[in-house]
Amino acid sequence: MPVLAFPGPAAPSPPSVTVEVPDGWDALPAGSDLLRARGTGAAGEPVEVTVRSHTGPVGYAATDLVDALADGVTHPGTEVEPSFVVEIGGREWVARNISWDESSGPVVEVHLAAVVDGPADEAAADEVSRLVVATGRVRGATLDADYDVLQSVLETLVVGGAQ
């Protein structure tokens, strides 16, 4: 009978991740995420960042992940911008902005995904694709100014391991 294990070939340990946040931001309990932080925007609305690990089938790329995340947003009037590539911390990230309106005002969410090298064991590396996804969210009347702060936070992402 097969034995499943964590960490193991189909469930590798998540990579180390760091992100720098402005003074006054709170580190929140991460739950199933790797990191979670929240700050207060210019008009008092929350500015949020989460980082989590994602394991997919072999060949699952960062573009596949941001496409799936965009497909999962079902708010009425959702606008999905084309994905784009950005380099952060020496690593290539695929990013996509998604926006919609809520009763409290506009919301913009940005998803950034990057492939993380697999485990040192070559056989295990052939079983899964390892990725990291960072999600940032801003909302409200000062969305543009808050997005600039969010972007400056996301630009500090560092993922451990080789690229």
Task: Give the ranges of each region predicted by the language model.
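Glycine-rich, often proline-containing surface loops adjacent to acidic residues and nearby aromatics
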Residues: E45-T50, E92-A95, V128-T135
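Secretory pathway targeting signatures of secreted, lumenal, and periplasmic proteins
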Residues: P2-D71, S103-G105
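Short glycine-aromatic motifs
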Residues: W25-A27, T78, W93, L157
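Surface-exposed amphipathic alpha-helical segments
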Residues: W25, L131-Q163
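Generic structural detector for well-ordered beta-strands
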Residues: E20, D26, E87, A114, ...
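Short beta-strand element of the conserved SAM-dependent methyltransferase core
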Residues: A37, V51, R96-I98, A113-V115, ...
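Short, flexible beta-strand-to-coil junctions
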Residues: H54-G56, S99-E102, V116-D117, T135-A141
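Signature of long, low-cysteine stretches enriched in small and polar/charged residues
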Residues: V66-A125, Q151
